[in-house]
Design a protein with these regions (language model features):
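Intein modules and their embedded homing endonuclease domains
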Residues: 2-158
Length: 158
């Protein structure tokens, strides 16, 4: 029986997760009303006042870096949950649950994974390759994915 290479197993899980990432409509996530406006626009005469009014509203709906950061992390969490894999932070460490056990992830490998996933989601290439954007994704993950230690039971010894 061979030993399990946990680093390879973790990388395989992260690679599988990245492959499942599909483009995300960040505008519709950031502005839920955009979808309704797009439907209304499709039903308007192209040069009508109503169409122009809707187009102006849609043009004002700009997706910014905060939207990309927040929704990228939410989408990664959704995909991990869909596969029964956990991704979380506990005591400033990142952990990956593969369905059987938790193991600690390398920070640099995880940041690289976040950037790859963001690129596949449709984050502009300049952002998805920029190290500062990777840091922001990582920081958002660290804030959003905190796993609190279970409360001590009064019946269990400390």
């Amino acid at each position: 029986m061979g030993t399990i290479n946990y680093a390879e197993l973790q990388q395989d899980i992260l690679n599988t997760l990245v492959k499942q990432v599909t483009p995300v409509n960040f505008k519709n996530l950031a502005y839920p009303e955009a979808k309704l406006l797009q439907k209304q626009l499709a039903g308007c005469a192209p040069d009508s006042d109503m169409a122009q009014s809707i187009q102006k509203k849609l043009l004002k709906m700009k997706v910014n870096e905060k939207h990309y950061v927040i929704f990228t992390i939410e989408e990664i969490a959704r995909l991990a949950e869909k596969n029964d894999w956990g991704l979380c932070r506990n005591q400033n460490e990142i952990y990956l649950y593969n369905g059987m056990f938790w193991s600690r992830l390398d920070v640099d490998a995880f940041q690289k994974f976040l950037l790859k996933a963001s690129e596949r989601m449709g984050v502009p290439i300049v952002s998805s390759k920029y190290y500062q954007f990777g840091k922001k994704l990582f920081e958002q993950f660290m804030m959003q994915s905190y796993l609190q230690s279970p409360a001590a039971s009064s019946s269990s010894p400390l």
